[in-house]
A protein has these predicted regions:
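Internal nucleotide-binding/catalytic subdomain
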Residues: 1-43
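Glycine-rich beta-alpha junction loops
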Residues: 4, 38, 49-52, 99-102
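Short, structured loop/turn "capping" segments at alpha-beta junctions
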Residues: 28-30, 69, 83-88
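Short coil/turn motifs at secondary-structure junctions
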Residues: 41, 53-55, 148
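Pre-DFG segment of protein kinase catalytic domains
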Residues: 45-47
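Glycine-rich phosphate/pyrophosphate-binding beta-alpha loops
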Residues: 49-65, 123-129
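C-terminal catalytic subdomain
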Residues: 62-75
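Peripheral (often C-terminal) accessory segments that flank ATP-dependent C-N-forming ligase machineries
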Residues: 75-156
């Protein structure tokens, strides 16, 4: 979900650590996707890739939650023309995968069928199947939302 619910100090720690990781790997220009876990306020990078984010992070979530043209920036970076600018959040976006682990979110999936905040819905039926990988969760369907706040069972 974007934006992440993080304190300003934690967000800054992540920015500094991510910059340090990219510099250490020699990634100076272009796309980069970093995944991290925060455990007991410690940062653990679990994936770093010189590519855009998957699971609709780049093509849908970032484009809809910020005033940042992700694809223009990617092209400009590849051509050596990218100029840094501040990015502002303009909405909340998120993706919920329709799998057994998310069966408690059934009210969200039901409401998404007719809600204006649902910008993509690939859920085919009400069966919540077990998912052991991204492929299985994508195959079982998902919804993507864009709204003034994070969509939860409590605010639909």
């Amino acid at each position: 979900h974007q934006p992440a619910d993080l304190s300003d100090s934690l967000r800054e720690r992540i920015r500094v650590a991510a910059t340090d990781v990219l510099k250490a790997l020699g990634i100076r220009c272009g796309l980069a996707h970093l995944e991290l876990k925060i455990i007991n306020n410690d940062l653990y990078f679990i994936e770093v890739g010189a590519r855009g984010g998957g699971d609709h992070i780049a093509d849908t979530l970032t484009v809809n939650s910020t005033d940042f043209d992700y694809f223009k920036a990617a092209i400009d970076a590849c051509l050596g023309r990218y100029e840094h600018r501040d990015v502002h959040n303009v909405a909340y976006t998120g993706i919920y995968f329709h799998c057994k682990e998310n069966s408690s979110l059934q009210p969200i999936f039901e409401k998404a069928k007719t809600a204006d905040w649902c910008i993509c819905n690939t859920v085919k039926d009400n069966t919540f199947s077990e998912a052991f990988s991204n492929v299985e969760t994508a195959n079982s369907g998902y919804i993507i939302y864009k709204y003034k706040e994070k969509i939860t069972v409590n605010n639909i």
